[in-house]
Design a protein with these regions (language model features):
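Intrinsically disordered, metal-sensing/regulatory segments
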Residues: 1-249
Length: 249
């Protein structure tokens, strides 16, 4: 429980750390942003497979795992219908903003999108610790935390462009981080109480992470003509997580 709580604050705090970096480097070049986000996508994809999907297969069977992955993806697909895709917002240029009210409307949608996507990521980290396999849990939590840093960085620019005060931007970032902490404790608590759902819960969490990588992160990294670099960055992130998991395990 103590380790899960520490991890929860670490995962949520990584988003805030990213926001602080975003304040320091407000105008991050698309090339650099795509490389960092691609690297984070690779880490997240590797963590989902190594820390969630493979353990789900070991705890259950291929059918439970397959259904869990699919249900996790469908869950986020339904959530996406309530919020805009992150790459539709983070890639906006100033000339695309019609007026201040339009800015603020998009900001609120942006915050909702981040929060909704952070909840299942937090649940994924919590489910990992609920499985009592600490090595796999650390792999997942570390992968999510590393992914949250560039995600926190990209929160800053759209909010400032919309005219939101710096203090309020920081408060909003804290809110999205708290959502992830709550998600971690929900995942840990649910699996701890009902061990029978562990294989499904692991696969569900893995499915949500893969969906985020495919539906949000990869399109964002491929939207500024740096696709090749983003692809190699993703591979680098995947391999990095693979090596880290090998030594952690």
């Amino acid at each position: 429980m103590k380790l899960a709580l520490i991890s929860a604050f670490g995962v949520g705090g990584a988003t805030i750390a990213g926001v602080i970096i975003g304040f320091l480097f407000r105008k991050v070049p698309h090339k650099f942003n795509d490389a960092i986000l691609g690297f984070a996508a690779g880490i997240m994809l590797s963590a989902a497979i190594l820390g969630l999907i493979i353990p789900s297969l070991e705890e259950g069977n291929v059918w439970v795992t397959s259904v869990g992955i699919l249900v996790g993806a469908i869950f986020l697909n339904l959530a996406d219908k309530l919020t805009p895709h992150l790459h539709h917002i983070t890639g906006m240029d100033q000339e695309a903003h019609a007026d201040r009210q339009n800015h603020l409307n998009k900001v609120m949608l942006f915050v909702m999108a981040i929060a909704i996507h952070n909840l299942p990521e937090g649940i994924a980290a919590g489910v990992g610790f609920g499985s009592e396999n600490i090595n796999n849990a650390i792999t997942v939590a570390l992968g999510i935390a590393l992914q949250n840093i560039p995600e926190g960085m990209i929160i800053v620019s759209p909010l400032i462009m919309a005219g939101v005060a710096k203090k309020r931007v920081f408060f909003i970032a804290c809110f999205t981080g708290v959502i992830e902490i709550i998600g971690t404790m929900i995942g840990f608590g649910t699996v701890s109480v009902a061990k029978a759902i562990l294989p499904f819960a692991l696969a569900f969490a893995g499915g949500t992470m893969i969906y985020v990588v495919s539906d949000e992160m990869i399109p964002e990294t491929h939207s500024h003509r740096y696709e090749r670099m983003a692809t190699y960055s993703l591979l680098a992130g995947f391999i990095t997580m693979l090596v880290m998991d090998f030594y952690i395990g």
